[in-house]
């Protein structure tokens, strides 16, 4: 398993639809890059100049929206994860 450092989080991206509403199957190049996912791991938080640590605002299990081209994709087995800085998370999706 991956453990993020500092103010980073690990996100499992939500799958995009494979077809349009009218039934057209999308190719990989035609799909929009997903910017939603579920947080699966959270780092310890950002360290300030005075040495104190700011706790993360997000938690494991939160569904979030993040910046379109943020982070680094990492493959582990069959799964692909995204490691992003907490600042790149735009919102928590509340159900």
Swiss-Prot record:
Recorded GO CC terms: cytoplasm
Main location: cytoplasm
InterPro entries xrefs: Chaperonin_GroES (IPR020818), Chaperonin_GroES_sf (IPR037124), Chaprnonin_Cpn10_CS (IPR018369), GroES-like_sf (IPR011032)
Protein's cellular compartments: Cytoplasm
Protein's GO biological process: chaperone cofactor-dependent protein refolding
Pfam families: Cpn10 (PF00166)
Keywords: Chaperone, Cytoplasm
GO molecular function terms listed in the Swiss-Prot or TrEMBL record: ATP binding; metal ion binding; protein folding chaperone; protein-folding chaperone binding; unfolded protein binding
Database matches in PANTHER family: 10 KDA HEAT SHOCK PROTEIN (PTHR10772), CO-CHAPERONIN GROES (PTHR10772:SF58)
Family, per entry: Belongs to the GroES chaperonin family.
Summary of subunit composition and partner proteins: Heptamer of 7 subunits arranged in a ring. Interacts with the chaperonin GroEL.
Function summary: Together with the chaperonin GroEL, plays an essential role in assisting protein folding. The GroEL-GroES system forms a nano-cage that allows encapsulation of the non-native substrate proteins and provides a physical environment optimized to promote and accelerate protein folding. GroES binds to the apical surface of the GroEL ring, thereby capping the opening of the GroEL channel.
Protein name from the UniProt record: Co-chaperonin GroES
Natural source organism: Staphylococcus saprophyticus subsp. saprophyticus (strain ATCC 15305 / DSM 20229 / NCIMB 8711 / NCTC 7292 / S-41)
């Amino acid at each position: 398993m991956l453990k993020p450092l500092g103010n980073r989080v690990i996100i499992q991206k939500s799958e995009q639809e494979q077809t349009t509403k009218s039934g057209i199957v999308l190719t990989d190049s035609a799909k929009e890059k997903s910017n939603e996912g579920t947080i699966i791991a959270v780092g310890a938080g950002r360290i300030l100049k005075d040495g104190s640590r700011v706790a993360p605002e997000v938690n494991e299990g939160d569904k979030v929206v993040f910046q379109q081209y943020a982070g680094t994709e990492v493959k582990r087995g069959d799964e692909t994860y995204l490691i992003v800085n907490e600042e790149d998370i735009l919102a928590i999706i509340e159900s």
